[in-house]
């Protein structure tokens, strides 16, 4: 599928958020996907995944997650990049992540070329996607190996109480893990699922891939698993488009 790509700036209460808008050629309208990256922001690897998702017929809206401290920066997949990404997270409060999300969803709600709104996220972005599911405008959410849900750790806040708010999830939820992910061990995976069911969530889908490492969908580096990536994306597309 032919795609078009452009930069869009979204005004938030205390900053401007640079986003990449990737959509099929044509006038639309399309279902939109709010697409949260990992700590490295909008790298070419991340954008390749976003483009691949757009090729299924979605308009993908990918924001920088650290607009206050790392605007315009795509970090390298090395130790320095990891340190910078963790510092960007540590400098951002849950309230700031949430206010950015509201601004992004407000922007999508105001577009005439958008129908349904979905959300996906990876790593810390998976945690942010889970919080996006608190907004009733998000029809379905897919969290890929989300970090920090089990202890509430996201950004500057030691406990964002994200799982404690599981009852606030209004749409359908799919969560993807790998069994070899040290950031989300078996007990943490069970805690996420148990919290959703205990909160009364009925539309929950869980995928746990044997042998999957953390960030197995990142298409560079030794942890990448192309087969699991294909399976995960196909499952996510099916889940989002299912009624």
Model-predicted segments: where are they?
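N-terminal cap/leader regions of alpha/beta-hydrolase-fold enzymes
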Residues: 1-243
């Amino acid at each position: 599928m032919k795609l078009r790509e452009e930069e869009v700036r979204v005004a938030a209460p205390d900053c401007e958020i640079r986003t990449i808008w990737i959509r099929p050629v044509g006038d639309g309208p399309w279902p939109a996907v709010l697409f949260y990256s990992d700590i490295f922001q909008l790298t070419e690897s991340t954008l390749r995944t976003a483009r691949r998702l757009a090729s299924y017929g979605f308009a993908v809206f990918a924001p920088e997650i650290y607009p206050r401290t790392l605007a315009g920066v795509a970090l390298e997949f090395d130790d320095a990049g990891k340190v910078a990404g963790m510092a960007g997270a540590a400098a951002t409060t849950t309230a700031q992540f949430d206010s950015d999300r509201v601004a992004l969803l407000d922007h999508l709600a105001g577009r005439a070329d958008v129908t349904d709104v979905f959300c996906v996220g990876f790593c810390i972005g998976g945690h942010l996607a889970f919080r996006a599911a608190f907004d009733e405008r998000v029809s379905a959410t897919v969290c890929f190996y989300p970090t920090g849900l089990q202890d509430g750790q996201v950004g500057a806040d030691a406990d964002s109480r994200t799982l404690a708010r599981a009852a606030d999830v209004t749409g359908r939820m799919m969560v993807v893990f790998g069994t070899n992910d040290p950031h989300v061990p078996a007990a943490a995976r069970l805690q996420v699922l148990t919290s959703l069911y205990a909160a009364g969530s009925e539309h929950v889908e869980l995928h746990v891939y044997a042998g999957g490492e953390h960030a197995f969908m990142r298409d560079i580096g030794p942890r990448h698993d192309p087969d699991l990536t294909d399976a995960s994306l196909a499952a996510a597309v099916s889940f989002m488009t299912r009624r």
